[in-house]
């Protein structure tokens, strides 16, 4: 790097200059002036900064680790606490968003109930039927309020709310609820789960994942009598299928040479292995080996953005 650059991201600091790159919990800058990078969703502490998309930085760190310069890639970045993103990259076009994940007003289970009820007539009938069939569970969904760890990514929110709808969790910690769904899914010993609807809708910002459809499909399966283990696994298995489909879309658009996987959601071994099974037949898969798959990789990748 020609100019000294610095980034602090979720407890990790990265610094780079003409002598190389380093990342750690704390980097000694020795009061020198640096170009500072700040994630798009964060508030800068100084006036002049360069804003960046964490998903792009995560991919950039993988590119550096695996020497993938000038390769066209599909990036899958699923963080637990920070914005997730599916996108493609090529040297000719740059970074192109494919599916965006935006924080929305559906942060509580009862918010989701109302959102599904007001979608359309089918949604209203589904909620009414759910209430008649599972009156106690319906009351629980209506009363549960997440108070801890509510600032999570959209995928984490979906899984957290799903655990309540399935009947796995009645507490107030969103992350704990998400982990309950994951631990239940691990106990499923079958090969495939029900098709949970991870679908995108067109918005002014681009194609965006609609969380209502995922929970709505789970409600239908619950009414059909699927057990908790199978239904929980469906959320993991169907997300892996969604990843594979988006990768094929990226390949059709720009002709990718591989896929990068990053973000804390991929600490879920079940999801990671299902994703590998769906992708590895057609595409090389790359992820961080020397860096953590979230946070540290983002900090290091950020300071090299712009040098692609």
PLM feature spans:
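Acidic, glycine-enriched active-site microenvironments
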Residues: 1-308
């Amino acid at each position: 790097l020609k100019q000294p650059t610095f980034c602090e991201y979720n407890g990790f600091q990265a610094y780079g200059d003409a002598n190389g790159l380093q990342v750690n919990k704390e980097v000694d800058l020795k009061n020198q002036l640096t170009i500072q990078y700040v994630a798009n969703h964060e508030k800068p502490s100084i006036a002049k900064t360069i804003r960046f998309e964490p998903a792009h930085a995560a991919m950039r760190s993988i590119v550096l680790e695996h020497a993938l310069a000038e390769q066209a890639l599909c990036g899958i970045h699923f963080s637990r606490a920070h914005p997730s993103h599916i996108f493609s990259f090529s040297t000719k076009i740059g970074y192109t968003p494919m599916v965006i994940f935006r924080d929305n007003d559906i942060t509580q289970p009862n918010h989701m109930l109302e959102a599904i009820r007001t979608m359309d007539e089918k949604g209203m009938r589904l909620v009414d039927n759910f209430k008649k069939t599972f009156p106690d569970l319906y009351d629980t969904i209506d009363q549960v309020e997440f108070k801890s760890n509510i600032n999570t990514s959209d995928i984490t929110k979906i899984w957290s709310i799903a655990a309540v709808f399935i009947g796995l969790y009645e507490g107030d910690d969103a992350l704990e609820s998400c982990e309950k769904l994951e631990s239940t899914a691990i106990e499923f010993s079958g090969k495939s789960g029900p098709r949970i609807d991870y679908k995108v809708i067109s918005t002014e910002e681009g194609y965006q994942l609609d969380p209502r459809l995922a929970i709505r499909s789970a409600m239908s399966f619950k009414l059909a009598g699927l057990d908790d283990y199978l239904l929980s696994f469906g959320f993991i298995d169907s997300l892996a299928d969604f990843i594979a489909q988006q990768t094929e879309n990226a390949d059709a658009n720009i002709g990718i040479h591989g896929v990068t996987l990053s973000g804390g959601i991929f600490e879920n071994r079940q999801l990671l292995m299902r994703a590998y099974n769906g992708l590895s037949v057609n595409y090389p898969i790359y992820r961080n080996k020397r860096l953590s798959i979230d946070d540290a990789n983002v900090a290091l990748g950020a300071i090299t953005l712009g040098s692609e």
